[in-house]
Amino acid sequence: NNVLPGYIDSLDHAESTKDRIPLGRIGTVQEIAQTTRFLISDEAGYITGQNLIVDGGMTRHL
């Protein structure tokens, strides 16, 4: 499994970047960590070979 993050607040992004993201904000490191935590938990035990896109809808918007 893979976590594919979009723009994350740990990097310096232009303020206008938020305008291109359907949710209207930059993602957080905590959101990526929570997704990773889920993937390694027993709750995701039957999920295999998946790419989880965590980008606030950016990919869908393209």
Where are the language model's segments positioned?
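Conserved SDR Rossmann-fold cofactor-binding beta-strand/turn motif
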Residues: N1-D9, I40, I53-D55
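A glycine/serine/threonine-rich, flexible loop-to-helix segment
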Residues: N2-I21, E31, H61-L62
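Gly/Ser/Thr-rich helix-start
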Residues: Y7, R25-T28, Q50, G57-M58
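A conserved structural motif in NAD(P)-dependent oxidoreductases
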Residues: I21-I32, E43
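Short, hydrophobic alpha-helical segments
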Residues: T36, I40-A44
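Short C-terminal tail/terminal secondary-structure segment
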Residues: R37, T48-L62
